[in-house]
Each structure stands twice: as C-alpha cells, then as structure tokens.
UniProtKB/Swiss-Prot annotation:
The gene is glgB. This is 1,4-alpha-glucan branching enzyme GlgB. The lineage of its organism: Bacteria, Pseudomonadati, Pseudomonadota, Betaproteobacteria, Nitrosomonadales. Belongs to the glycosyl hydrolase 13 family. GlgB subfamily. Disulfide bonds: none annotated. SUPFAM superfamilies: (Trans)glycosidases, E set domains, Glycosyl hydrolase domain. Monomer.
C-alpha cells in the first residue's frame, strides 16, 4: 500500500484543533491525532515536536510522513486505511550526537478503554475498585504492550502524561476526556517499566499549568522525589490461603487480640542509620513478635508520604506502599510471612485529612477537588492539612477504593482509622465562627458519617473477618455498633477514656492515689457500651509526654514496678490490647522516629524484667480463656472489691464461657499487704499463675508460694475467701485449680 501524491492534502494551518493542540488546550486529541477519514481519504497525524522526520509503517514498509506544521505535526494520506496498530519511526536530530532513531506504536491508534459503567459508578460514589480504572496499568491492546493512564480532573482543560519516556513534555501525550465524568485516559505503548511520570494539568478557568503526581499510583520514587512510577508486573505468590480461610470464620469477639503497634522506620535500623526493608522486617520483627506473644502487628501508616517526621499520617499516595522500605511485592512478602506464622497485620489508614503539598491532591486540577473550597470546612487547623470533601461522590469512591485496595491486594487483616473524631464534628478544634453547620444547623458532619458507615459495610461484606478500628476520642454513641441499628459499624473503638484515666492515676504518687480511686473504677460504667481496645499507643510517648516508664512516679525500683503493674492491669481488664513498640521493655526515652528503639537497654536487668513480664502476660492473655473470651460482655467481669481506696487495692474476676474464671488483685501502693482477705466464688485451691513482683521480672519476689486454699470464711459477698500476701506495686492473677482455665475454645 502506498500514499498517493495526487491526493489533495488540505492545509491544517487554520484548523482550530491544531491551534488547540499547540496551545495545550485540546481536550480530545483523538479528534485530530491518529487515524481519521477526512475529505474522503485516510489520514494519520502524529505530533512529535522533537522529531526531524517521521516514517509510518505501511504494507509497503516505512513511508515518509509529511511535515504539516513546523511545530512537529506530521501527516500521511492514503486511499485505504492502514492496518492497526501501526508503528512510527521517529528521527530526532541532535547537534552533539548522531541522530536518534526509534520505533514506537502510535498512542492515538488505540481507542479509550474505560467503561461507561465504571465511570457511572465512580461518579455515583459506588466504585469500590476505582484503582482498577484510574491510575496506571499494564495492559496489552491489539497485541501491543503498554500502560493505560487515567486520572480524574473535571476542571481541567487539558491533561497530559509526562515522564522520563517523553522528556516531561506535556505536548506529546495529551489525554482524552471522558466528558462530564471528569476522567481523562490514554494508552501509551512501550512505556518502560518503573518509568517516572506525572500529569500536566491545564486549569480550565485560569489556564494555570500544574504538575501533579498520580493519586492512584501504586509506586512512587523515593522521597524527596514525588513522581509516580509506571507499573511493573507483580511476582508475588501468596501462601496464606489457610490463614485467610480461618480469618473468614473466626470469632474475633471471643478471640485474643493483642496488637503490637510499629513504626517501620524506627523499630530497628542498620548501623548506618538506614531503614530496614519490608523483607528485613519479616526476618527480624516477625520472630520478635512471635516470641513476645502478640497476635497482630499494627503498622503506622506505610502509604506513601513525603515527610519522615509525619510518621506517615500526611499521606500523598493512598494506593502505594511507601518506597522507603521497598516495593509493593516486598510488603506483600512481609504480610504473607506474618500470616504463615499466625500473625495478623493491621494498617493505620488516614482518611481524615491530607497534606497541602502542591504536587499531590491539594487543588489537584486547580480547583478544590478532594477538599472543600471554604477553609471553614476544608482546612484542619491543628495539622495544617486539608479535610476530604466526603459529600463529593468521586472522593467517596477514592477513599473506599483505597481501603478496598489495601485489604484486597495486600491481604491486610484490618484498618485502624485515624482521627475519626475530627471527621465526625464540623466544629472539631474550632472556635465559634470558624465552622459551618450542617443542613440541620448541627455540628455533625453528615457526609463523613455516611462515608464511615459505607466504609464499614464494604469491609465487613467484602472481606470476612477483616477488622476496622476507630481512633475516636469523644463520646459519640455507637461507634462499634452495627449500621443497621444506627451505629457507625466499626469492629472496635480505642478506649481513650480508660487510657487517659489510667495514666493520670498512675502518675500520682502512691501516697495520693487513695484520693483518685474512682479513676480505676469509673471505666466499668461504660466498658460495654462499645467494643473497646485498650491502647497505650505512640500518641502517649511523643511530643514531650515522655515514655511510659517516665510517667511512673518514684525511684527506679518503683517506676519499673509501677510499669509492670500497669501492664498487668491492662492485660486483665476487659477489652482487646494494644501497645506501642518499646513499651514492652520499658524504653526510658520518649520515642523519636529518627532513630531506632533503645534496644541496648535490654542489657539492664530491670528492662529485661519488664520485657519478660510483658511476654508472660501476653502468653497468659492468649492461653487463659477468661482473660479474652468475654471482653465485650458484662457477664465476663465482676468486681470482687472496688472500694478499698484506703489501700489503693482493686480486685475483680474475669469469666470464660465455660464458667472458669481468673481472679485479679492489684496493689497500687509500695506497701506490702499481708493476710489480705479476698472473697472468691468457689472453694478449693487457687494457683498463682502470675505475680508481677517476681524476681524474674525485677521484683522483690513477695508472693504466695504458687498456690493458696480457701479458708471457708465468706467475704465481700462471696461464699468463700482466700488470705493472700499482696506484694508492693504489684498485680497477681489466680485461677482455680479444679476448673479448666486454659481453654481458648470456651
């Protein structure tokens, strides 16, 4: 086949499409570039501003294209169509080196692929897998491999893909608009794996040119770079089918849940200060977690973020594992290894706000797209970040898809949702006049409430056994109650009230604790209003708050004893458990994300003792059914004595479903209590299965010689009693020797 010179080639110099293309304002490049029928003939146009010459591959070989405009527009005209797809041979002249000649397939010979159905669901806020439509994807079209790019930018006049493969030139690869949906798309053949790219966006109203990274990218360059990376094929082979099947049917309400909260960048580091990779964490963190008896790891946000000091809470890449620690496959390797060892993995996820960095979501297409225009709704005053516009359907699709992506692609076992209180209230951390009420005149963020309910419905329906945990610091009712009864639908909520009361109480000198006894007992008034997690999280050991050990009063002996007592209280009180890394061995310094934990302190006997106590408590918590099986049921707890304020002693029973129980006695003063009588529900022998004052933990080794028998004397409204020695600043756990206490099946 050949081009016919007798064909009259009309001039394009006055063509408005040409002028729009050259001005960077052409919203439908397919109307001008690629193959067309014009004036009864076939024409192929290509725009390559750096080309000296272009040839097109026809049935007769490569034929020269005519330069139709000096800016780099080339044409080929024929009487019959070219077979698709076709290749272009491009020669780029250089004054410093031989001409560079290369062959490419024409991007504008491949029609758009995004479906109208997906666009409809996306615009309705109901597309839970928008990450499959938007972003960059390896695809093959007509036997040609390449990358399909798509992005949402409804207020753009033109969007181009720019990257290392096209000299970052926004003229070369303008995308096609899908009209009112606001989505732009382009398939580019032959994009090299892991190429850097961004979107160049021209705002419709101002003409401003913006350079934005891809919100849906799955991998970014290592900070301080901000470009997205073109995708590469995953080589991950999962080996956690057994774990996933068991998770789908597990009764998590009655199962041990003991979370080790980890900041991946500062748990441990190499001698030169560099991070451990995801794979290295699998080699080092995972064995440690197993040794210590935790059931889950909760990772502080590992979605991509530009600033190390934000700990991940200022997310810019909601679909990408941060490249600080490796690739997505590396993270999958870590999670897979955890599952094979029986450890779950929870991700700290941040849908409450996003940073103002100009390269990312903020004013993405020159308008307030993901955020509110009005700063009274769109600006978080505490953190200087933007608040998502939950009332915008496409934003809802974005966030729901982000959650779906992490749970689906990475087999994560749950999401801890950060800063829920800031989402629920329009006046959160605002003075009168600094916020706008909802349509009913109230302070509740109705759109955020709807979003959270939809999030939880999606997670629980599509990912059986996956958990959602809310960091919610107010008394909002029903956070962990089902949506069908008016709740938000979370699996669990952090018990911030218990945590605050407990730490305030523990800071008191034991001499004065008798005057604050209610801080230990008040929590039972609301303990079953939600499914609670008892957290001693990273938030309690930063910003001048000191370490947990540093909060404990007294000399060194008392500080360590107090901390062992605190952990005994936490691990025996109703609710699932969470501790931040370093708590378990009594790190002395406040956490600093720029260095690893103070592991050298384990050479000190007291620190090693706290670690051993934490390990043994973790193992007892999992082994003794009464300590975990009825965390959310009032029938699982009973006070023995909550009134002994003068001695600062409390005692209570924890019950399993089979009737077995554990007796917990806690002494919050440094004064030993000899012949201290405790009422018990059953006569017989009681085994002391834990004593935080044991010499193995660094204590004084005062106790009850392993077991004790009832006296036959009723006490504290119980049918019998035991008389015990209560060590100073210590907690004791007893079980009845005739009842099957260690029975996780109930």
């Amino acid at each position: 086949m050949r081009a016919y010179p007798t064909i009259q080639r009309p001039s394009i110099k006055r063509d408005p499409r040409l002028h729009a293309l050259l001005a960077g304002r052409l919203h439908d490049p397919f109307s001008f570039l690629g193959p067309h029928v014009e004036h009864g003939h076939w024409v192929v146009r290509a725009f390559h501003p750096h080309a000296a010459s272009i040839w097109i591959n026809t049935d007769d070989g490569f034929e020269s294209m005519t330069r139709a405009h000096p800016a780099g527009v080339f044409e080929w005209w024929g009487l019959i169509p070219l077979p698709l797809p076709y290749q272009l041979r491009i020669e780029e002249a250089s004054f410093e080196a031989p001409a560079h000649v290369y062959d490419i397939y024409d991007a504008y010979a491949f029609p758009p692929q995004v479906s109208e159905h997906d666009l409809y669901l996306f615009n309705e806020g109901r597309l839970h897998q928008a990450y499959r439509m938007l972003g960059s994807h390896l695809v093959e079209m007509e036997g040609v491999a390449g990358v399909r790019f798509s992005v949402w930018a409804p207020n753009a006049e033109r969007v181009s893909v720019v990257g290392s493969f096209n000299r970052w030139d926004g003229r070369i690869h303008p995308m096609v608009s899908h009209g009112a949906s606001g989505v732009w798309e382009l398939f580019i053949p032959g994009v090299p794996t892991d190429s850097f790219y961004k979107y160049e966006i021209r705002n419709r109203d101002t003409g401003a040119i913006l350079l934005k990274t891809d919100p849906y990218a799955r991998h970014y360059e290592v900070r301080p770079g901000t470009a997205a990376r073109a995708p590469s094929a995953s080589r991950m082979t999962w080996g956690d089918a057994r774990w996933m099947a068991q998770r789908a049917v597990w009764d998590w309400l009655a199962t041990p849940l003991n979370i080790y909260e980890v900041h991946a960048g500062s748990w441990k580091r190499h001698a030169n200060g560099s991070f451990y990779s995801y794979r290295e964490l699998a080699d080092h963190l995972l064995p440690y977690v197993r040794e210590m008896g935790y059931t889950h790891i909760e990772l502080l946000p590992i979605s991509e973020h530009p600033l190390d000091e934000s700990w991940g809470y200022q997310t810019t890449g909601y679909f990408a594992a941060t490249s600080r620690y490796g690739t997505s496959d590396d993270l999958k390797f870590f999670i897979n290894a955890c599952h094979q060892e029986g450890i779950g993995v929870i991700l700290d996820w941040v849908p409450a706000h996003f940073p103002q960095d100009a390269f990312a979501l903020a004013r993405f297409d020159g308008s307030a797209l993901y955020e509110h225009e009005d700063p009274r709704m769109g600006l978080h005053q505490d953190w200087g970040t933007h608040i998502f516009n939950y009332g915008r359907n496409e934003v809802k699709s974005f966030l729901l898809s982000s959650a779906h992506y992490w749970l689906s692609e990475f087999h994560l076992d749950g999401l801890r949702v950060d800063a829920v209180a800031s989402m629920l209230y329009l006046d959160y951390s605002r003075l009168p006049g600094e916020w706008l009420p909802n349509r009913y005149g109230g302070r509740e963020n109705l759109e955020a409430i709807d979003f959270l309910r939809e999030l939880n419905i999606m997670v629980h329906q599509e990912f059986p056994g996956a958990l959602t945990l809310a960091e919610e610091s107010t008394a909002w009712p029903g956070v962990s109650r089902p949506t069908y009864v008016g709740g938000l639908g979370f699996s669990m909520k952090w018990n911030m009230g218990w945590m605050n009361d407990t730490l305030v109480y523990m800071r008191n000198d034991p001499v004065y604790r008798r005057f604050h006894h209610e801080q230990l007992t008040f929590g039972q008034l609301y303990a079953y209003s939600e499914n609670f997690v008892l957290p001693f999280s990273h938030d309690e050991v930063v910003h001048g708050k000191g370490s947990l050990l540093g909060k404990m009063p007294g000399d060194a002996w008392q500080q360590f004893a107090n901390l062992r007592l605190l952990f005994t209280y936490q691990m025996t009180y109703p609710g699932k458990k969470l501790n931040f890394m370093g708590n378990e061995f009594a790190q002395g310094r406040e956490w600093n994300s720029s260095r690893e934990l103070d592991w050298y302190q384990l050479g000190d006997g007291w620190h090693e003792g706290v670690k051993m106590a934490a390990r043994d408590l973790n193992q007892l918590y999992s082994a003794v059914a009464a300590l975990h099986q009825r965390d959310f049921e009032p029938e699982g707890f009973s006070w023995v004595d909550c009134h002994d304020a003068d001695n600062s002693v409390i005692s209570y029973l924890r019950f399993a479903r089979n009737g077995s129980f554990a007796l917990v006695v806690l002494n919050f003063t440094p004064v030993p209590r000899y012949r201290y009588r405790i009422g018990v529900p059953t006569s017989g022998s009681y085994q002391e299965i834990f004593n935080s004052d044991s010499r193995y933990y660094g204590g004084s080794d005062l106790g009850n010689m392993g077991s004790i028998r009832t006296t036959g004397q009723p006490s504290m409204e119980r049918m019998d009693s035991i008389v015990i020695t209560l060590p100073p600043l210590a907690g004791l756990i007893f079980v009845h020797t005739d009842l099957p206490a260690i029975n996780t099946d109930g």
